[in-house]
Amino acid sequence: MDLTQLEMFNAVAEAGSITQAAAKVHRVPSNLTTRLRQLETELGVDLFIRENQRLRLSPAGHNFLRYSQQILALVDEARSVVAGDEPQGLFSLGSLESTAAVRIPATLAEFNRRYPKIQFSLSTGPSGTMLDGVLEGKLNAAFIDGPINHTAIDGIPVYREELMIVTPQGYAPVTRASQVNGSNIYAFRANCSYRRHFESWFHADGAAPGTIHEMESYHGMLACVIAGAGIALIPRSMLESMPGHHQVEAWPLAEQWRWLTTWLVWRRGAKTRPLEAFIQLLDVPDSARQGYQ
């Protein structure tokens, strides 16, 4: 097994095609096919499921991809450390939509300014999706609702979010779930931690939401609430950043439900130089930078 084989494997895993991967790594397709077969023989497992002209990762391939990505990232880091260079390489960050919108824009701008050699990418989604991306090696780190009790994850607390029940104008104050029992709610998909928190708030008071409408953005949720179609749960920081927030009522949850903490998490043992550089720009106490294990 050598680094070239790992680079080829990663390229095919990403492209799903020998031809496309060969163009990316500047090799002829037959060379990739031969080297991948050699790698599979050496490991004693099939890394890909071959379907006509397409390849998709087998379960063993998914597991191997995590390690292959970590190995190549560490090699890049070792090269830059020995050469005395500034941090460089790929850095893929995932984030909750609200965090990306109101918490980190200035940090991202400063990160890109300071480290132009880092190839940075950002994706957003619910906590469950972002955590899966980290565990699968697709993301170097992600902002999610935490803490996460997982043996393969490290992380640090970064932001404390106040959650608000958002209702149409004219609603009486909402202090408990029974007051909005049966109301239609607007939320993200079921793997969103805020949605699970919202539903738990209902159930703890012996209440239940009406129809749960799944939305793709907080802006869509707010528009539906403004129209009088239901209610939503939105972080105060996000709500106050959106046009139209003066057209709704907003009520903080009771204290035991009111606050959630956003964490930055990464795979254990995969704290690369780009990630360390990013953490240094976050406004978090030094005592929190060590995270948990």
UniProtKB/Swiss-Prot annotation:
Where is each HTH lysR-type domain found?
Answer: 1-58
A GO molecular-function annotation: transcription cis-regulatory region binding
CDD domains hit by this protein: PBP2_YofA_SoxR_like
Q: Name one GO biological process term.
A: regulation of DNA-templated transcription
The protein's matches in Pfam families, at most eight in alphabetical order, are given as: HTH_1, LysR_substrate
- Residue numbers of the DNA-binding region are 18-38
Please give the InterPro entries that the UniProt record associates with this protein.
Answer: LysR_subst-bd, Tscrpt_reg_HTH_LysR, WH-like_DNA-bd_sf, WH_DNA-bd_sf
Could you list this entry's UniProt keywords, alphabetically sorted: DNA-binding, Transcription, Transcription regulation
Family to which this protein belongs: Belongs to the LysR transcriptional regulatory family.
- What name does UniProt use for this protein? Uncharacterized HTH-type transcriptional regulator YneJ
Q: What is the lineage of its organism?
A: Bacteria, Pseudomonadati, Pseudomonadota, Gammaproteobacteria, Enterobacterales
